[in-house]
Regions:
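ATP-dependent helicase/translocase motor core
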Residues: 2-258
Length: 258
């Protein structure tokens, strides 16, 4: 769903509570459960005091990945409430908004495109003209993650993108240094490298798979996969299921380790 141009919309957030509430209700949850889920999500995504962006982002990821544990009423057994239907991608509400104005302290910023799943901002894309390098978009994303800009908005963001029509799409996660933003290299029928990579990485099932299966939090650093690591893992998984052996052939610097 296209949510529109949110440049002048008030109250833009990384959790659009009305959308999330409606989706949770469509999954059969009552108002009491939904309010408790929203309260937990709001608490865990907050940055402040000893809680840094990495900590809040990891806490939100745990809620996304493993569900929110909610006790409906006193004395009742806890239930796991899922914020995302990982098994059935089409059962989720996917939406994008452009020019999303986010109020910061003291500076306000406006990400080009935000990808929402069930009302939760999970991806952000900075797009540049072909005459402006993708690195400019990467640095813009990194600046936006600073405390003086809109750091709080990135507490739910799982994948960070930047690109242009000539260089294609680069991807990383929160805190990824500019030099580690990677180009997604996959053959396809679309000639334009930016359109091709966005279509490949942001396809519903692929987007959720990358978040669910290809993100790690390693000693204070959040990481995601390169293209070859993604396809190598899928091939290895298929062989393991079929009880077949094999060799994954790597070259120096190809990402054998995290």
């Amino acid at each position: 769903e296209y949510l529109g141009d949110w440049q002048d919309r008030e109250g833009n957030s990384n959790v659009e509570e009305e959308i999330l509430s409606n989706w949770l209700a469509s999954q059969g949850h009552n108002a009491t459960i939904i309010n408790k889920v929203l309260t937990k999500l709001d608490k865990d995504k907050a940055i402040g005091g000893a809680t840094q962006l990495y900590d809040a982002n990891r806490a939100v990821y745990d809620l996304l990945r493993y569900g929110v544990k909610v006790q409906p009423e006193a004395g009742e057994q806890k239930q796991t409430i899922w914020l995302v239907d990982w098994k059935n991608p089409e059962n989720n509400h996917f939406a994008v908004a452009e020019e999303v104005t986010i109020l910061g302290k003291p500076h306000t910023k406006r990400p080009d495109i935000v990808i929402y799943v069930n009302g939760i901002a999970l991806g952000v894309i900075e797009l540049k003209r072909s005459t402006v390098t993708a690195s400019h978009g990467i640095r813009q994303n990194l600046d936006n993650q600073k405390k003086e800009f809109i750091q709080h908005f990135f507490s739910t963001i799982q994948l960070v993108f930047a690109g242009n029509d000539t260089e294609g799409l680069r991807h990383g996660v929160i805190g990824t240094p500019e030099r580690f933003f990677l180009q997604w290299k996959e053959d396809g029928d679309i000639d334009n490298p930016l359109d091709r990579s966005i279509t490949q990485m942001c396809e519903k099932s692929r987007f959720l798979e990358l978040i669910h299966d290809f993100i790690v939090f390693d000693a204070g650093i959040k990481k995601t996969c390169r293209t070859n690591q993604y396809f190598g893992t899928l091939a290895t998984r298929e062989r393991a299921v079929n009880r077949e052996g094999g060799i994954v052939w790597h070259t120096q610097g190809s990402g054998k380790s995290l």
